[in-house]
Amino acid sequence: MARGKKMVDRVSELMSQPKFIRNIGIVAHIDHGKTTLSDNLLSGAGMISEELAGRQLFMDSDAEEQARGITIDASNVSMVHEYEGQEYLINMIDTPGHVDFGGDVTRAMRAVDGAVVVVDAVEGTMPQTETVLRQALKEQVVPVLFINKVDRLINELKVDEMEMQVRLAKVIDKVNKLIKGMNEDMYNNGWKLDAAKGTVAFGSALYNWAVSAPFMQKSGVSFKDVYNKCREGDMKSLAKSSPLHAVLLDMVVKHLPDPFDAQKRRINVIWHGDKESVEGKSMLTADPNGPIAMMVTDISFDPHAGEVATGRLFSGTLRRGTELYIIGSAMKANRVQQVGIFMGPTRVEVEELPAGNIAAVTGLKDAIVGSTVTNLREMVPFEALTHYSEPVMTVAVEAKNMKDLPKLVEVLRQVAKEDPTLVITINEETGEHLISGMGELHLEIITGRIKRDKGVEIVTSEPIVVYRETATRKAGPIEGKSPNRHNRFYVELEPLDQVIVDLIRNGEVSMNQTWIERRDILVANGWEKDEAKNIKDISTTNIFIDMTKGVQYLNETMELILEGLHEALQGGPLADEPVQNMKIRLVDVKLHEDAIHRGPAQVIPAVRSAVKAGILYAGDSLLEPIQKISITVPTDQMGNATSQIQGRRGSVLDITSEGDTITVVGRVPVAELFGFSGDIRSATEGRAMWNTEFAGFEIVPNSLVKDVVIAIRKRKGLKEQMPRPEDYLA
C-alpha cells in the first residue's frame, strides 16, 4: 500500500497545476490492445507490478470483463509520469472497443482532452476505429496514434523490414484520411498525424516496448534493431531499451493539450451559454476559484458509499460539504460527501479537487450521466451527449421469485443510471420490464450483472428487435376532440427532412439553443422563417410547431398539449413503438373559456388521439434497425461470405482485397442477424472475422409490414388487427 500512498501524494500535488495535467482516453476497435496497453502504462508508472501487467487487466476490474477478455465499462486511473525533469499528472480512461459499449466511449470523450488511438498493425483501421475517432473529433479531443502488435507483422506475416515500414505508413495514411474526411479544418490546423513529428508511436503492448521518431533519435534505436529483435524473439531487451510507458507517455505529454489549452477551444463546442458570463470566463480559463461547473460522465455504485458520480470538472474546486445543484432536476441542493480520484477500481479520497481534473464524487443523488453540476442556482447546461448508436434489441425480464420484484425495480433504476445507452421500460398492462440495448452482447452482460452483482434471480426472454414508426407522406389537418367535446385541436403532419434529422442527432438543432440561433440554422437549411421561429418542442427526432394565431388560453394549456404529444410519440398507433422523424404542426385550437373544462383529462387525450390518427393518415410505416457488417475471409471463401449477407435481406456495398484475404462490407437488418455467428463460422469453416456497427433505421419492406406489426401487437397484448385512423377519432 505504501506505493499507492506515495502515488496519491504525488497526484495531489500536481492536481492544482493544470499545465502539468493531461486528461486522456485510450480508444480503439475491440481486441486491438487498449487494456493491455493501459496496464503496461500503469506498470511503468509504478502502480502495478511489471510481472502482472498485461495479464492482471487492472483496468478490467469487473469479473465479466476478465472472463470475456474484453472491456465493458470505461475505467479511470490517475498516475504520474516524469518528462524532461518535470512530473506530469496523467488522468487516463480505458474505454471499451466493442460496438455494443460505444456509449462508454461517448461519455469518456467528454471528460478528456486527448486520445491515444490504438490500431492493430495487422488488421489496420476497423469500423469501430472510425466511430471512436469521429466521436473524439466531435468533442474537440486531439488524437495521437499508437500502432500496436508490430511483432505480429514480423513473426506471423513474415514481412521484411521494408514491407513492415510500408504497412505502418499505410495505417498512418488511412487514419489521416479518416481525420481529413471528418474535419478538414482540424486536419489542416495541426491535427494530421505525422511519425516524423512524434504524434505516432509503434510497438507491442503485450511485450511492453514502443518506438517513436523522437525516441529513436534520443536512444539510437533504429527500425532495423526493432526488426531484428522481433525476429530473434528478444522482446525483453526491446522493453528495456524502449519501454512502452516512456515512449507513449512522452508523446502524450508533448503532443496532447493541458486543460488550459483544451478548455479554451472545447468550451465553445460543448457549452452554449454566454462566454462573457462569470461561469463562461471561468470555464474558458479552468479557473479553480470560479463557480463549480462539472459534467457527469459516469455513475457507478459503491457498496459502502452508494452512488459515485464521475465527471470532468471544468471550473471551480470541489470540497466535501459543498452544496451543489443538478441543472434540470428538481433543484434540491445535493451535499458533496466525498471527493476523490480513481486509481483503477479503487477510489481514493482527496481533500479538494480543482478545475481541469476528473473527479469522483459521492452525495450527488440527483445526478445522472450527462448532468451539469454547479453551485449556481441557474446555469446553461452542457451540450447533451449524443451517441452514434441507438438501442436495437430488447429483452423482457422478470423476477424468478415474486418477493424479489421490488428489488428488481430498484436494480433496473440503478442500471439505467449507470448506463444511459440502455432504455428501461415497464409495461403497466402486462407488468413486464423491458431492457433495450445496443446488441445481444450488451444485453447479455447487463442481465448477467443483475444476477451476479445485484443478487436478483431473473428470467429473460429471447431478444426482440426494436422497431420505430414514422410517416411517409403529408396529412391533415386532423381534428382531435376532448372527451367533453368542448376543446378541439387541429394538427398537420409530414415526414421530417433527413437533413434536419441529422442536425438534431448531431446536437446542432436543439431546445437548448436560443430560438434565434435555432431559427437561423433551420432557415439556412430550407425552412420557412415562420415555422422555424415557432418551434415549441423537439423530442428525439420529432419537431412540434405552433402555427396558431391569437388563440386565447393557449399558453396556459401548452404544457398539457406537449404531454399529449409525447404520449402519442412514445408509442405510435401501428405497433406502440416509438415515433421518429416527424414534423407536426398545430394549426388551430378551440378551447373552452372555463379552465375546469380544459384540464389534463380533456386536453391530453384529445391531442394524443389527433396525433395518432394523423400518423396513420400520413402513411404510418415501420422502421427497422440496420447494421453495417464487415466480413474478412480468405479469397476462396468470398462466395460464402456474400451469400450470408444476401440471404439475410442484406445488400453487399463493397468488396476489397488485400493479399490473400477479402473483406466484404454489407448492410443487414438486425432482425435477420440472430444466429449469424454460428452460421458464418460453419459457412466459412471457422475462417471468418467479422464486426458490425449501427447504420441507422430503414423502412421495413411493404410485404413484411403486416406480419411484423401483428406479431408485435400480439406480444404486447394489443388487438391483433391493423389499426385504422377511425379507432382514434371516436
Curated annotation (Swiss-Prot):
The name of this protein is Elongation factor 2
Sorted alphabetically, which SMART domains does this protein's record hold? EFG_C, EFG_IV
Q: Which residues form the tr-type G domain?
A: 19-260
Q: GO CC terms for this protein?
A: cytosol; ribonucleoprotein complex
Q: Tell where it localizes.
A: Cytoplasm
What is the recorded function of this protein according to its Swiss-Prot or TrEMBL entry? Catalyzes the GTP-dependent ribosomal translocation step during translation elongation. During this step, the ribosome changes from the pre-translocational (PRE) to the post-translocational (POST) state as the newly formed A-site-bound peptidyl-tRNA and P-site-bound deacylated tRNA move to the P and E sites, respectively. Catalyzes the coordinated movement of the two tRNA molecules, the mRNA and conformational changes in the ribosome.
Q: From the UniProt record, report the name of the gene that encodes this protein.
A: fusA
Pfam families membership? EFG_C, EFG_III, EFG_IV, GTP_EFTU, GTP_EFTU_D2
Listed GO MF terms: GTP binding; GTPase activity; translation elongation factor activity
What UniProt keywords apply to this chain's record, in alphabetical order?
A: Cytoplasm, Elongation factor, GTP-binding, Nucleotide-binding, Protein biosynthesis
What PROSITE patterns does UniProt report for this protein, alphabetically? G_TR_1, G_TR_2
What family is reported? Belongs to the TRAFAC class translation factor GTPase superfamily. Classic translation factor GTPase family. EF-G/EF-2 subfamily.
Q: Gene3D superfamilies attached here? A: 3.30.230.10, 3.30.70.240, Elongation Factor G (Translational Gtpase), domain 3 (3.30.70.870), P-loop containing nucleotide triphosphate hydrolases (3.40.50.300), Translation factors (2.40.30.10)
At which positions is GTP bound? 28-35, 94-98, 148-151
Diphthamide modifications at:
597
Task: Output the InterPro entries linked to this UniProt entry.
Answer: EFG_II, EFG_III/V, EFG_V-like, EFTu-like_2, G_TR_CS, P-loop_NTPase, Ribosomal_Su5_D2-typ_SF, Ribsml_uS5_D2-typ_fold_subgr
Instruction: Please give the chief subcellular localization of this protein.
Output: cytoplasm
